[in-house]
Amino acid sequence: MARYTGPHCRQCRREGLKLYLKGDRCYTGKCAIDRRSYAPGQHGQGRKKVSEYGIQLRAKQKARRIYGVLEKPFRNYFEHAERQPGITGENLLRLLERRLDNVVYRLGLGASRVEARQLVRHGHFTVNGKKVNIPSFQVRVGDEIAVREKSKASPRIKELVERAADRTTPAWLEYDGQEAKGRVIALPSRDQIDAPVEEHLIVELYSR
């Protein structure tokens, strides 16, 4: 599956805020946006008027970068969200939140969505007892996400499991630190999604 392979700090600088794509590094003085809080490139420090389309485009790009989704699958998520009953923008966010890599991150079993995606791809997690290595896998209410038994010996996995015990889990998930597993207890409501996304701008962009 295709994925972005460029510098993650450049993405944060482009959006003008921390997207927490590099986990622990984002909380240190090494964070690029703390040192250079302007857009990358030759004209990054210049000011220019942004059009309505430009604002909508930036909202979409920011959402894509937060969740690590390329343009074509992101458009597919939007079209799926349009077909669902309810508010399209909220449906879109709910689909993105239900990605397996995002759920692993939300449970604290990845320091960032980037790391969570990598761990899923390497087969460290099961869903309802079966190994799933597809980051975009859509979890459902009642699904149980767990660290594979053979993966629990990994030093990095051990560290993440220990740290997850002290991390606040979103209300739509529950986490059992003793067993290193979590469960989806509900679909996330809009107020339970803290990603800095202005979904109405994305809807406006795709409705042009």
From Swiss-Prot:
Give GO BP annotations, semicolon-separated.
ribosomal small subunit biogenesis; translation
According to the UniProt entry, its GO molecular function terms are: rRNA binding; structural constituent of ribosome
> Which InterPro entries is this protein grouped with?
Ribosomal_uS4 (IPR022801), Ribosomal_uS4_bac-type (IPR005709), Ribosomal_uS4_CS (IPR018079), Ribosomal_uS4_N (IPR001912), S4_RNA-bd (IPR002942), S4_RNA-bd_sf (IPR036986)
Q: Which SUPFAM superfamilies match?
A: Alpha-L RNA-binding motif
**S4 RNA-binding domain sequence ranges:** 98-161
An annotated GO cellular component of this protein is: small ribosomal subunit
Q: List the Pfam families hit by this protein, alphabetically.
A: Ribosomal_S4, S4
Q: Which UniProt keywords apply?
A: Ribonucleoprotein, Ribosomal protein, RNA-binding, rRNA-binding
Q: Does the keyword DNA repair apply?
A: no
Superkingdom, natural source: Bacteria
Q: Which residues form a coiled coil?
A: none
The protein's matches in CDD domains, at most eight in alphabetical order, are given as: S4
Describe its assembly. Answer: Part of the 30S ribosomal subunit. Contacts protein S5. The interaction surface between S4 and S5 is involved in control of translational fidelity.
| Function text | One of the primary rRNA binding proteins, it binds directly to 16S rRNA where it nucleates assembly of the body of the 30S subunit.
Family membership noted in the UniProt record = Belongs to the universal ribosomal protein uS4 family.
Protein's recorded name: Small ribosomal subunit protein uS4
The species is Desulforamulus reducens (strain ATCC BAA-1160 / DSM 100696 / MI-1)
Q: Lineage of the native species? A: Bacteria, Bacillati, Bacillota, Clostridia, Eubacteriales
